[in-house]
Amino acid sequence: MITKAIVILSIITAYVDASAFLVYNYTYTLQDDNHRYDFEVTDYFNDILIKRLKLNSETGRPELRNEPPTWFNETKIRYYPKNNYNFMFWLNRMSETLDEINKLPETSNPYKTMSLTIGCTDLRQLQVNFGYVTVGGNIWTRFDPKNKRFSKVRSRTFPKVGMLTVKSQHWERVMEHLGSMVTLTCPFTADDYYKISKGYIDKPVKPTVTVTGIERGDNTTLICTFDNHYPSSVAVKWYNIEDFAPDYRYDPYVNELLPDTDYLPGEPGYPTITRRLGDKYLFTSSPRVMVPTIMSNRIACVGFHSTLEPSIYRCVNCSGPEPVLQYQGDRRNDLEDEED
């Protein structure tokens, strides 16, 4: 019953047939007050660095700073970004936009960095495409594929200047280079990376998932640990498992307990607290949430990884009361009986 409910509630989309975690990152950095700057583009697939391009201050052009993997062949990748990942386009857009942000009256201390992150991750029943902008290390805005524009994240608004607004004279190309990938093409691109890397990079490794609790008075921190997994991308959704019980409620939706973060499950930056284990391509992640201790056995983690079917994981050491999962009768019928 519970497993079936999770499958129904999961975001079911077409996904590639194996692990695919693709991230392009563009970072613009002001180095000093003399307007000297740096710009870097990185391409990672399943945590493997494919290319790192850095601005050559003497030539003003991108320069490759690493040796790409021998298996990498960009001619076999659909929708692969041309012109060195559109290096000069994003350099100019991000430079202009950060300059406009720093000129705003509300900007008391000028920002030094701006990053654009584009990509997607396949977590079986959870396919996430993302495109977002961070300024000064904090996420400012996310590209909304439904409305085809940047939108605010939960905790803040964002200045509609430069490349962040549909009024930009370059908006058509922003949509071409960013919008199309976030909205549509990223999973196909990631699938091509997977096909050409097959046999050359490590196979996905299924994590062991365990939920433990750290009790401090009236509150308990639940930790959903993914141990020894590859690639690094994981996500969790927290639910009150009593919502899955067949009882008197008529609400067809199960409410997710949202962690306090501006990132979406599966995005880089989502608070999974992921670290690499030694020199191997193995990772451990420990997303967490704080709940009232009385709820510690009722709140469950649904874990997502490219090797996992979504499953419910409950705390193994919590002291809260056990959840009530049996059928409790039909409130509507009870009320009708009282009226009779």
From Swiss-Prot:
Pfam families: 2L_N_poxvirus (PF21584). Signal peptide: none annotated. It comes from the Viruses. Keywords: Immunoglobulin domain. Residues 207-294 form the Ig-like domain. InterPro entries: 2L_N_poxvirus, Ig-like_dom, Ig-like_dom_sf, Ig-like_fold, MHC_I-like_Ag-recog_sf. This is Putative Ig-like domain-containing protein C1. It comes from Swinepox virus (strain Kasza) (SWPV).
